[in-house]
C-alpha cells in the first residue's frame, strides 16, 4: 500500500520569489475594534495584512493613525499597502509612492476602481498602471476580474501574481462565475492566483483552493462577522483544508453512480442478481 505522509503535501506559497507560510491574506478595515483586529490576525497568522493608506491615516494624521501603525508592526506580519479608493492612474501612482515611503516596502496591491457602484476594477487602464509601478520597482499584486485576456495582459507587463475577484467587493457571494475562474486557473497554471474579493464563507475559500487557486484575501467576511476572531480561525482552517484537498487529487466527478463496494467477495445471491441484471 502506498501512503504519502501529510508533510510531503505541504508546498511553499511563493510570490515574487518570497516564500510565505500561509495562503491567507487579511484586510484590516471595518473591524469592531483594534483589539478584535489584533486577535483575528494572531489567530489566523496570515501571510500579509493589507492596509489602505488613504483610509487608515497611517501617515500620522493624529494619534489614531500612529497607534494603528504601531499595532501592525508589533504583530510581526508583513504589510501589503493597497491603493483602495483610487479612481485615476495618477492617484494610484501617488498613493503607491507614499505607501512605499510610509511602510518601507516595495509591495503594493494595485486597486484602480472603474465604477464606484460595483467597485469593478478599471480593466482598460489597469495594465498600463501596473507597468508604470513595476518600472518604479514595485512588486505589484493587481486586483482584477477573472477575464483571461486581461490577466494575460497583466502578466505581459510584468506582474508575477494576480488577484482576480470571485464576486464584487463586500458581497460575500462566493464565486459567481465558476466556469471562468476554473478556465483562468487551467490556462495560467504557473501563475500565483489569489482570490481577492467576494468571498463570504469559509466554504467559499475552500472551494477556490480546491480548484487550484493559490490563496485568498479576505476583509469584510471576517471583519463583519458576528464573531470576527472565530471567523478568522475558520477561514485559516478552510484555506489549509482546500489546499490539502487540491494536492491530494480529488476524485473526478461522474454523471452516473458507481458503487464504491466491488462485486468480488459479495454474497453469491447478490452476485447472482447482478449477473441477471447485466
From Swiss-Prot:
Gene3D superfamilies: Aldolase class I
Pfam families: ThiG (PF05690)
GO MF annotation terms: thiazole synthase activity
UniProt-annotated catalytic positions: 109
Principal location listed in the UniProt entry: cytoplasm
Reaction(s) catalysed (UniProt annotation): [ThiS sulfur-carrier protein]-C-terminal-Gly-aminoethanethioate + 2-iminoacetate + 1-deoxy-D-xylulose 5-phosphate = [ThiS sulfur-carrier protein]-C-terminal Gly-Gly + 2-[(2R,5Z)-2-carboxy-4-methylthiazol-5(2H)-ylidene]ethyl phosphate + 2 H2O + H(+)
Superkingdom of the organism of origin: Bacteria
GO BP annotations listed: thiamine diphosphate biosynthetic process
The protein's Enzyme Commission number: 2.8.1.10
Keyword Nucleotide-binding among record annotations: no
CDD domains: ThiG (cd04728)
Function: Catalyzes the rearrangement of 1-deoxy-D-xylulose 5-phosphate (DXP) to produce the thiazole phosphate moiety of thiamine. Sulfur is provided by the thiocarboxylate moiety of the carrier protein ThiS. In vitro, sulfur can be provided by H(2)S.
Protein name per Swiss-Prot or TrEMBL: Thiazole synthase
Amino acid at each position: 500500500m502506498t501512503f504519502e505522509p501529510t508533510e510531503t503535501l505541504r508546498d511553499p506559497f511563493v510570490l515574487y520569489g518570497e516564500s510565505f507560510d500561509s495562503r491567507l491574506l487579511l484586510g484590516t478595515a471595518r473591524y469592531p475594534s483594534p483589539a478584535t483586529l489584533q486577535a483575528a490576525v494572531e489567530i489566523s497568522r496570515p501571510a500579509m495584512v493589507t492596509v489602505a493608506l488613504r483610509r487608515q491615516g497611517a501617515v500620522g494624521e493624529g494619534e489614531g493613525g500612529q497607534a494603528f501603525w504601531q499595532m501592525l508592526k508589533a504583530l510581526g506580519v508583513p504589510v501589503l499597502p493597497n491603493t483602495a479608493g483610487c479612481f485615476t492612474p495618477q492617484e494610484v501612482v501617488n498613493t503607491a509612492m507614499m505607501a512605499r515611503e510610509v511602510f518601507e516596502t516595495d509591495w503594493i496591491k494595485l486597486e484602480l476602481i472603474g465604477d464606484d457602484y460595483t467597485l469593478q476594477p478599471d480593466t482598460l487602464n489597469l495594465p498600463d498602471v501596473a507597468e508604470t509601478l513595476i518600472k518604479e520597482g514595485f512588486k505589484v499584486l493587481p486586483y482584477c476580474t477573472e477575464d483571461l485576456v486581461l490577466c494575460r495582459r497583466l502578466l505581459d507587463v510584468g506582474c508575477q501574481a494576480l488577484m482576480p475577484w470571485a464576486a464584487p467587493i463586500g458581497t460575500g457571494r462566493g464565486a459567481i462565475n465558476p466556469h471562468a475562474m476554473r478556465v483562468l486557473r487551467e490556462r495560467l497554471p504557473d501563475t500565483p492566483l489569489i482570490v481577492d474579493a467576494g468571498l463570504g464563507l469559509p466554504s467559499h475559500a475552500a472551494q477556490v483552493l480546491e480548484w487550484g487557486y493559490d490563496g485568498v484575501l479576505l476583509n469584510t467576511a471576517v471583519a463583519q462577522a458576528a464573531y470576527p476572531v472565530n471567523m478568522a480561525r475558520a477561514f485559516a482552517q478552510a484555506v489549509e483544508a482546500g489546499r490539502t484537498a487540491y494536492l491530494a487529487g480529488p476524485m473526478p466527478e461522474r454523471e452516473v453512480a458507481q458503487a464504491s463496494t466491488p462485486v468480488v467477495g459479495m454474497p453469491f445471491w447478490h452476485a447472482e442478481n447482478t449477473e441477471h441484471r447485466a
